[in-house]
Amino acid sequence: TSYGTGELIKTALDRGCRDITIAIGGSATNDGGMGAMRALGIRFLDENGEELSGCGNDLARVADIDIRGLHGAVKDAKFTIMCDVNNPLTGPDGATYTFGMQKGGTPKILDELEQGMIHYAALIREKMGIDVDQIPGSGAAGGLGAAFSVFLKAEMKSGIETVLDLIHFDELLEGVDLVITGEGRIDWQSAFGKVPSGIGNRCRKKGIPAIAIVGGMGDKAEMIFDHGIDSIITTINGAMGLDEALERAEELYAGAAERAFRMIKAGMKLQDRS
């Protein structure tokens, strides 16, 4: 469960922290954030009034939410959540179907978890008066985004947008002709608030072309073209396994960069001819 994350937050609160920023993602959990909230004192009860542990298979069993034991310092604390995706809690683009398979979920398990997540979302709507599926990023980290937004009143911020603002990225773009970004593996998820889409959207606003050099391409990678990325160059130059690709990463990325710039040079020659 996400219980350990809640323990870290509790420790921070116990030590006097009142302005807490949490970057979420890569959780390996799909519990709707119940585990983390349990560590902070919230009780999730079944139909018999028994407290649940807050793991994924409890999503369908939770019948009531008791927030009376929530850590007393939460009301005086400001929580900011940095998140690199804007997926909702449920649905085809939600926490379970988007990220569940990479966490080991089989199709049968994913269907069961999704039904549990739908039930959990409905209970939150009933008890807290909040439709979590209307909160961008509520499906991040297996639903941690939803729990932080609802129970901690956290402000959700795009992780990449926050970082780009911190480094004054827009100012760095002044006088720039081309931006090159990258990702280990680019696929349809990359269009949902991840680094390439964040950078591409900023570049598009200023009319600056941007390309991505990536380790590999996955399903619907071309969706990134709607977010300011003009082209994708892969590093792989032949049949090879992941271990070899990682071992030769520096060499492969250098080769991909050279191919990218040769293509740009060819484009400049075409422009000269016109």
Name each model-derived stretch.
Residues 1-24, 28-274:
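N-terminal loops that bind phosphate or other acidic moieties
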